[in-house]
Amino acid sequence: MSALLQVGQSAEFAKTVTESDVVLFAGITGDFNPAHVNEVEASKSRFGGRIAHGILSAGFISACIAMKLPGPGTIYLTQSLKFTRPVRIGDTVTARVEVLEWNEGKRRARLARRRSTS
């Protein structure tokens, strides 16, 4: 039987963040921080306008893992995040994961993940 995953395998998931994404995420999470939902207040912030929730864009990493690599049925155990720049409505976010280690016996992988914005 061949290995489910191999070191070096990678996958990407890309999505353009929309107004609806931000509003729905605020409603689901209860995070109505003006930085996300109020353009007037957000324009006074260091970002100069509204930004998407950081965890919204981090969710694209989850989508990549759950739907592409390793794929459906994957149980996502841990993640460490660092937000390096804001994501704005209209930005396209690409989440990329790469297999760094694969333990066939335990069926566990260690993945590198990266999020880029354009």
Task: List PLM regions with ranges.
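Glycine-rich loops and low-complexity Gly/Arg-rich segments
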Residues: 36-41, 76, 85, 100-102, ...
